[in-house]
């Protein structure tokens, strides 16, 4: 690669269909009322670790703080939820398992923690066979960013002679025979609580409206950049130069957006309304 600041990533434009890695940057757009109000660019191959630095630097430069943070499933993590809570903001983040959790395969998977009954008072799960999975231990897991998450490990006392064992216990690469294995999993109580609260918000009327507008406005800014402006590759090298180029492009997007909104008499509109079915 010719840019030492870039990172090899898998691109959506994969003509050979072989998952070829190309040097690239992770560009993040913060959009409000269809205008790009803030952007960052970095070498992170995934979106999860970009949210907190994005919000921090945006709040340092702006004179106000956004109350509601709307993001896609790629930004969901306990660390991001916790930061938004501590920052007195409200998260509208689509859970990573939101789409798959609606499938029949997911709902019928008896080995998933989501399909087990939880007794909050006594802190144990009950599996399909009626056996209890009790708390075995607690461990602290540290992420690459330094965030520490408390994981609770639950285990079943006895899984012998269980008719649901093959469907419940996963992991075919284990050296221990299935007959000798017991059901065990780890989970974060804090993350489970955060995801549950967030799910209630995103399926509400307000949540649906904000999620639809995120898809239209945030994804739309990249669609206009790539499709309408035919911008596919940065002309500069080095992260600072690429950032400057991205800012110029965002300014051009905003000018075009303002012109189109004036022509369509939509300058006072901040959100697209949901289409109502009969």
What would you call each of these model-derived segments?
Residues 1-278:
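Anion-binding and metal-coordination hotspots
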